[in-house]
Design a protein with these regions (language model features):
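Membrane-proximal interfacial segments on either side of biological membranes
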Residues: 1-253
């Protein structure tokens, strides 16, 4: 038997359901599977993807490009799939891989236009480091030390979020903050925590103008202890978010 001879297969898989058509071309060489999309759409939005899947050892690396994504519906659907975040399924320590999701247009969110969401499954953790929300006019929001892990049978999300503001004028206009209450704002920093089975979020840190380097000219303002978490968790729409933001800036010393 020729040990150098490789087992090679190729083909195409098509999935059709209301408003969507997913066509995947694949090629299998021994334990390695490569996939590519072909003229696919998801809920009438164009989608393309490519990647590799290794059967032994098992891992995957997949890039997905989405024409648009409704972020609120995406989060809602994720909560419905909460049961998949289980030690025996996606958070199994034997499941390792990376999915990079590039979104050209975000729906359902007022400030941000695009997204790059990097999802890593590593040794029982879902890691979101290097994920990014982009506002063409205002700035970029970076997610660092962001992960989901199981702690005492609870699925816990933790994240450090850094919102780099490139145009404070545009941000203030978006939030309708009166000019008399505006400050020089370079960034907003948050540390958040959420039990995925509970409909509330905990904010451990909330800082305006976090000092990143010694050359920063703006004074850091730590609001972590003054936030009303119950009020934050009760926010239901953009009007309430703007009202909440106005109250924060009007109460700054």
């Amino acid at each position: 038997k020729d040990k150098n001879k490789k087992n090679t297969y190729d083909g195409k898989i098509s999935l059709n359901f209301p408003g969507s058509e997913i066509n995947t071309k694949y090629k299998i060489i021994d334990n390695l599977i490569s996939i590519n999309s072909e003229k696919s759409n998801l809920k009438k939005n164009n989608i393309s993807y490519e990647g590799i899947i290794s059967a032994s050892p098992f891992y995957y690396n997949i890039n997905v490009n989405l024409e648009s994504l409704n972020i609120l519906k995406f989060i809602e659907n994720l909560s419905k799939l909460n049961h998949l975040l289980d030690e025996k399924i996606l958070l199994d320590k034997k499941v390792n891989g990376t999915i990079l999701l590039n979104v050209d247009y975000l729906k359902g969110i007022k400030i941000f236009d695009k997204a790059k969401i990097k999802i890593n499954f590593v040794n029982g953790k879902l890691i979101l480091n290097d994920s990014l929300l982009i506002s063409n006019k205002i700035g970029k929001m970076y997610f660092n030390n962001s992960f989901i892990e199981i702690v005492e049978d609870r699925k816990i999300l933790k994240s450090k979020i850094f919102f780099e503001i490139e145009s404070q004028k545009k941000l203030y206009q978006k939030l309708q903050i009166p000019k008399k209450n505006r400050i020089k704002l370079e960034n907003i920093y948050l540390e958040v925590e959420k039990d995925l089975d509970i409909d509330e979020i905990i904010i451990n840190k909330f800082i305006f103008n976090k000092q990143i380097t010694n050359t920063s000219l703006q004074k850091s303002i730590d609001l972590s202890d003054s936030l009303d978490i119950n009020e934050i968790n009760s926010l239901k729409n953009w009007i309430e978010v703007k009202k909440f933001s106005k109250n924060i800036f009007s109460n700054l010393d």
